[in-house]
Amino acid sequence: MKGMCKMKKKAALHNLGCKVNAYETEAMQELLEQNGYEIVPFKEGADVYIINTCTVTNVADRKSRQMLHKARKMNPDAVVVATGCYVQARGEDIDPCVDIVVGNNKKKDLIAILDEYYNAQHKVKKELLDINHEKEYEEMQVTHTAEHTRAYIKVQDGCNQFCSYCIIPYARGRVRSRNLEHVLEEVRTLAASGYKEVVLTGIHLSSYGIDTGESLLELIQKVHEIDGIKRIRLGSLEPRIITEEFASSIAVLPKMCPHFHLSLQSGCNATLKRMNRRYSAEEYMEKCDLLRKYFHNPALTTDVIVGFPGETQEEFAESMDFVDRVNFYETHIFKYSRRAGTKAAVMPDQIPEEIKSERSAKMIELGHRKQKAYEERLLGTTQEVLMEEAVETEDGIYQVGHTKEYVKIGLKTEENLSNQLKNVKIEDTKQIIH
């Protein structure tokens, strides 16, 4: 048996944060399985607890700390491993309940780090690199995922943007793109295992290839050629990648899902400038218009921050008006979270929490109205749905999956349709699941 363990040890993992983190957690789980560990649910007793942390907001920091303490409380004798963005950004300031700290570019070495820890008679172990100088992509691979129909594939790490509110470039380092052929190998493996949809994801997906002379468009076109894959979906994109060439080129690919998450953050130019977002609201709207030019009724989704430092009532109203005019399918609202070490953290005119909450509630209500309007346009249409699971409701059993636009749809039947593509006529709003 590989690895350090003579007896089969139990390991439990918990993921916090984005799809990139989720991918890395699944890759670490595979490493543990390959080296003789038994994977158990986090709520069960384990010999090793691994928490992949997040630091995107203060709430994420708090949840990360809570999970680390929960692991220690569940088994005081267990090895508690902290990895991910929270520990990378915090450096040496890590809670004493943690036995091992693994930086964001050392996750592939998890087994060796555990071996060394045990061989060193349980001395506290820290594996943190100065990630800002890291130039190599950390190659990890997933052959199966928690979902049995859709697989997320990490193709890129790091970010060079340095938006004034964001701590992630400090936790993830500069842009590093995965070898294109390695991505294709993983897609082929997943296709052979029966996965029908792949989602290309990264910390700053739009930057894929800027360090290797390749491009995201080239990667999409290569993935499209792989047999077995029926759908290609993209993670969050920067608006600037949506050019006439990009939109027209992906629109001719039958497997391409017309679901685009374009980060907005604010619809007010003055706020965007303070955020260092590098585009105007007008430019953003042009990108949305381009996508609607080449795709029929695409689902456009976004993120919006309310209560950014200096955001006046007039600026907020301008942002609300812009979101209203874009007609997003989904709008994810975040109250500005002050992150130490960022430019925004020391900006004047910080907004009180009660005002942030008021603005958040208004933006959420607007988002819900826009989502309802988009969904109502689907009534009477027939949509291709990738079935994923059975859901029991008061109205009976529904087989549930997602359209290419990522609208969750139910078909009332007891027949198991998991991982099948079915054309479903949407006759009632009850079929649209939230």
Regions found by a protein language model. Give the residues of each.
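Alpha-helix N-cap/loop-to-helix initiation residues
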Residues: N21, T57-A60, V87, P239, ...
